[in-house]
Amino acid sequence: MQVAGKELEVQQGALCGEVLKEALSKKQFKNVVVAKCGDTLLDLTTTVPADCTDLEPVMADSKEGLEVIRHSTAHLMAEAVKKLFPTAKVTIGPSIASGFYYDFDYERPFTPEDLEAIEAEMLRRVGANEEFTREVLSSADALKKFEEMGEDYKIELINDLGEETVSVYTNGEFADLCRGPHVARTGMLKAFKLLSVAGAYWRGDENRQQLQRIYGTAFPDPKALKKHLAQIEEAKKRDHRKLGTQLDLFSVNPEVGAGMTIWHPKGALIRAILEDFERKEHLKRGYQFVQGPLILKRELWEKSGHYDNYRENMYFTEIDEQSYGIKPMNCLSHMLVFKSRLRSYRDLPQRYFEHGVVHRHEKSGVLHGLLRVRTFTQDDAHLICRPDQLRDEIIGVAKFVGDVMGLFGFEYEAEVSTKPEKAIGSDEDWDRATEALEGALKEMGMEYSINEGDGAFYGPKIDIIIKDALERRWQCATIQCDFTLPERFDLSYVGEDGERHRPVMLHRVILGSIERFIGVLLEHTGGALPAWLSPVQAKILTVTDSQNEFAQKVLQFLREKGIRAEVDDRNEKLGYKVREAQLEKIPYMLVIGDKEVAAESVNVRARDGEDPGLKSLEEAAELISTAIDEPFKRGGMSYSFS
């Protein structure tokens, strides 16, 4: 069989670790976490499957290897918690994108001192180099085992699984219900850090037991961990909630409700500029503007399938004994626009666009500033086309996304998400849609990965993942294929043959949630938004009251040039005014003293530390305007806010 790219003769009953050790150098094998046969990950202590023809090592620095390390570290943490707090009950502890967590049921809150003690105990267990062992038990034996341990949550999980057998992993004195796989020994888990404690509900149900979730992170080596912890500290400084207050952009008031944003004047202006930019770009690309109501009759949501598949995330109200659903998506109104008149094949594609306000019931525990909210605005479009136009429409949207993300300086990558367990539509439709999405990306030469089972319930999708300045990944743009809703709403067009035909539809967003995108952009830039998007592009700072009259003249001049400017003529020291403007992330400060008044000029200071110095009003305006226009010229675009 093939082992790590080599042809080896493997004896029946050989262990994965033994076989890989023979195929690899000592240095290489030291970094092997688990083995892989096909799509299946295997413990190194597992016997090589009889039908395995290609065994590969999973290295510690790979994506899959990192997930295993983090999952194993979650078990290590649970072992330490049970040692120090024997009455704590364990629930679940998976790896996540940034690390891992484990949820515990314990009678008092865990403190920062507790986390330090848990970490110290984890390090002792690492030093002991305990083995991770896997045991397959009948469900009856597993129930007996966890009943003796008093682990009620594990008992519930076993009962819900309904399997004849389950696997249990043991490290040291700790046993856990788990599919695995895990590292061979705790000695491999040397680079970890416990980060915080948060509340959680058992199985995400707010009506069930409240638990304590300990978050942590782990890496293959201390250097990678140190880099990540430095990024966490930088992220705290860039937290968009902190910047939102500092820059006076938005607030979330408990009197209004959780997950609902109040936009202040400067924040509302940022939104208005973004939306204006998007409207103009959509017009250039042949989109038509539409707008639908906030609430629609429940029967429409039943017809679309949302009521059966999405109602737990929706809000409902009753008017005149008629049930209405507050829209979580904008697609239904757009389809009714298409259906409002007879369409010819010559009319297609139809591209409908709306900045639509939607409401979704997100659980309170996941709400987070602008990044996770209950009411938000989507830059939502639906492209209804002939099947032969589908690939070109996907390519057009993907290029649109690339232009916009390039404008903001984001690197991005694509993921194709395939059919989930809970889905509507035939396998044939899903296969056709998935092939169209992948084919478009291949035609563009865009690399992509497959995200199995993560499509929406009504169709596969392309997610565009952007990477910010802290190397965090965010999903913003989505291109989603849908053969199902045109069928449910009986959409049709008259073909060249004079017969009725069914169109196909793309759901798509570019920025996604406007709120979320602004939150991501604030953290990406640390609040120093590009000049074109800054609510105030220049601040005029006077040295004394004697310059106030000229400052107003400068203000009027800049505004006539289309530059958003303010005057700070308070009776404060210049240094104080400069520091405050820097905290407000103003792109340009224009200082006016007696010398500048006499020369009818300004002294320009840039946010990035450059000091252009004394400039005439025309020169200063030209300098600022060039900075505003530069990102658009770089991308072959043009824009002015109006």
Swiss-Prot record:
The cofactor binding remark recorded in the entry reads: Binds 1 zinc ion per subunit.
Query: One of this protein's Pfam families, by short name?
Result: HGTP_anticodon
Q: Does the keyword Magnesium apply?
A: no
Map out region (Catalytic) in residue numbers.
239-530
In short, the EC number is: 6.1.1.3
Q: Where is the TGS domain?
A: 1-58
> Where in or outside the cell is it found?
Cytoplasm
The coenzyme or cofactor needed here is: Zn(2+)
Catalysed reaction, written as an equation: tRNA(Thr) + L-threonine + ATP = L-threonyl-tRNA(Thr) + AMP + diphosphate + H(+)
- Main location per the UniProt record: cytoplasm
Q: Which domain of life is it from?
A: Bacteria
Tell me the first and last residues of the signal peptide.
Answer: none
Q: Any idea which positions bind Zn(2+)?
A: 331, 382, 507
Stored InterPro entries: aa-tRNA-synt_IIb (IPR002314), aa-tRNA-synth_II (IPR006195), aa-tRNA-synth_II/BPL/LPL (IPR045864), Anticodon-bd (IPR004154), Anticodon-bd_dom_sf (IPR036621), TGS (IPR004095), Thr-tRNA-ligase_IIa (IPR002320), Thr/Ala-tRNA-synth_IIc_edit (IPR018163)
> GO terms for CC?
cytosol
Q: Which GO terms describe its molecular function?
A: ATP binding; metal ion binding; threonine-tRNA ligase activity; tRNA binding
Q: Which GO terms describe its biological process?
A: threonyl-tRNA aminoacylation
Q: Which UniProt keywords apply?
A: Aminoacyl-tRNA synthetase, ATP-binding, Cytoplasm, Ligase, Metal-binding, Nucleotide-binding, Protein biosynthesis, RNA-binding, tRNA-binding, Zinc
Q: Does the keyword Ligase apply?
A: yes
Q: Which PANTHER family match?
A: THREONINE--TRNA LIGASE, CHLOROPLASTIC_MITOCHONDRIAL 2, THREONINE-TRNA LIGASE
Q: How is this protein organized at the quaternary level?
A: Homodimer.
Q: What does this protein do?
A: Catalyzes the attachment of threonine to tRNA(Thr) in a two-step reaction: L-threonine is first activated by ATP to form Thr-AMP and then transferred to the acceptor end of tRNA(Thr). Also edits incorrectly charged L-seryl-tRNA(Thr).
Q: Which protein family is it in? A: Belongs to the class-II aminoacyl-tRNA synthetase family.
Stated name of the protein: Threonine--tRNA ligase
User: What organism does the record attribute this protein to?
Assistant: Maridesulfovibrio salexigens (strain ATCC 14822 / DSM 2638 / NCIMB 8403 / VKM B-1763)
